Amino acid sequence: MEPKAPQLRRRERQGEEQENGACGEGNTRTHRAPDLVQWTRHMEAVKTQCLEQAQRELAELMDRAIWEAVQAYPKQDRPLPSTASDSTRKTQELHPGKRKVFITRKSLLDELMGVQHFRTIYHMFIAGLCVLIISTLAIDFIDEGRLMLEFDLLLFSFGQLPLALMMWVPMFLSTLLLPYQTLRLWARPRSGGAWTLGASLGCVLLAAHAAVLCVLPVHVSVKHELPPASRCVLVFEQVRFLMKSYSFLRETVPGIFCVRGGKGICTPSFSSYLYFLFCPTLIYRETYPRTPSIRWNYVAKNFAQALGCLLYACFILGRLCVPVFANMSREPFSTRALLLSILHATGPGIFMLLLIFFAFLHCWLNAFAEMLRFGDRMFYRDWWNSTSFSNYYRTWNVVVHDWLYSYVYQDGLWLLGRQGRGAAMLGVFLVSALVHEYIFCFVLGFFYPVMLILFLVVGGLLNFTMNDRHTGPAWNILMWTFLFLGQGIQVSLYCQEWYARRHCPLPQPTFWELVTPRSWSCHP
């Protein structure tokens, strides 16, 4: 019995220690709980940052590795695994600069939609559309006693759409047949005068192609006074066809003219060119990475989202812009009114920018990519995280940036040498600014170089001053501030000019009256 006494005493002491420990733990648990929550949140944030950084670095590493492999492979004495034509291989040998490499990858927003926090932001935008619809119904019910949505602005913008779609057919046929036939004529064996005659005929076909694309849309839109949205269809297809046909010839013609010995060369297949005209890229390749199947529910979802963005934009213009700017030209001009109108337009302007980005660069391009099983969905990158305008211009629209980089910047370096980097970059800005201004002039029906000045002058200065050396959240805030102000200036000035030309029409305007802003002198 005696040996059990020490054991009993030890058990009693252990019980007391456990009770004291439990009491102490209960006292400290309430103090440690907030620290544990904060520490958990901190670790989750660190984990998210590490994963995002690792994903970006891995993607860049893989892109670089694939590009280096593609560049190094033709130098070996082995045939390419793809069925690339002789002209494509000759082009790669002639221009050893960095070429666009297509790989299978998702769009960034599709990846971010898998994160619940980002999906909530998407839901907030949908809730904003619902609020606009409710407010429109409430205002119409209070003012006019009816509960019905009117889409007058939408119907006006898309007026005469069938005519615009009819004009698309000859534009498409011209792009489909004439450049490809020109390439076939130039690829014939160079023997005697037959090749010279064929080459001359090819130049005539290209001139006819350029005339159809440049003259027909302008003539139809001016003669029939097409509204803005119908003009958008024509001008975007006009620019797209010109850029695609140029890329097709630019990628194939150099290899053809470098063939020696008077031999002919195998031209790309017609099916590859036809696929290129519809796939969402402006860089021609004979083959692209393809997905295994088509998700038709994904296609329908993207088209529905694009339609929702269109309705969203109409509600924003109808509720936030039209009431403000419709009668502004009837009032005397003042700097105060102009400044207030610009600041008022910053909100609608940035909303329009985001809607255009999401509707076109994400929904529309992804829908066509899915229908055509086009694998490379990197139509944009994380431009919203940019801390410099140079990075913003590179990541906002990757589709157009790739074309400008390949055929304006790199060709400029090839012609001017490495010392001409500044001139090549200036050429990129000049081409982009002129095309943007042409699109605005075509759609709105008047010349008002707001976009030209903002893009070429202000954007060019910001590109060279706010470069990639600047990092940190302050620079991102500054970039967004300039975006807000720039969008406010565009929306305000273009809306004022639109209504001024309707309030103060000129019966027989001269050339200078056509190019002079009417909002500067219209005060009926």
UniProtKB/Swiss-Prot annotation:
Enzyme class: transferase
GO MF terms held by the record: cholesterol binding; cholesterol O-acyltransferase activity; fatty-acyl-CoA binding; sterol O-acyltransferase activity
Modified residues (Cysteine sulfenic acid (-SOH)): C279
Entry annotation: catalytic residues: H436
Chain segments annotated as transmembrane: 119-140, 161-186, 199-222, 231-254, 296-328, 346-371, 420-444, 451-466, 473-504
Biological processes per GO annotation: cholesterol efflux; cholesterol homeostasis; cholesterol metabolic process; cholesterol storage; response to nutrient; very-low-density lipoprotein particle assembly
Assigned EC number: 2.3.1.26
Pfam families cross-referenced by the UniProt entry: MBOAT (PF03062)
Motif FYXDWWN motif location, chain numbering: 379-385
Membrane topology, record value: Multi-pass membrane protein
Quaternary organization: May form homo- or heterodimers. Interacts with INSIG1; the interaction is direct and promotes association with AMFR/gp78.
Domain free text: Each protomer consists of 9 transmembrane segments, which enclose a cytosolic tunnel and a transmembrane tunnel that converge at the predicted catalytic site: acyl-CoA enters the active site through the cytosolic tunnel, whereas cholesterol enters from the side through the transmembrane tunnel.
Function of the molecule: Catalyzes the formation of fatty acid-cholesterol esters, which are less soluble in membranes than cholesterol. Plays a role in lipoprotein assembly and dietary cholesterol absorption. Utilizes oleoyl-CoA ((9Z)-octadecenoyl-CoA) and linolenoyl-CoA ((9Z,12Z,15Z)-octadecatrienoyl-CoA) as substrates. May provide cholesteryl esters for lipoprotein secretion from hepatocytes and intestinal mucosa.
Protein name: Sterol O-acyltransferase 2
Organism, scientific name: Rattus norvegicus
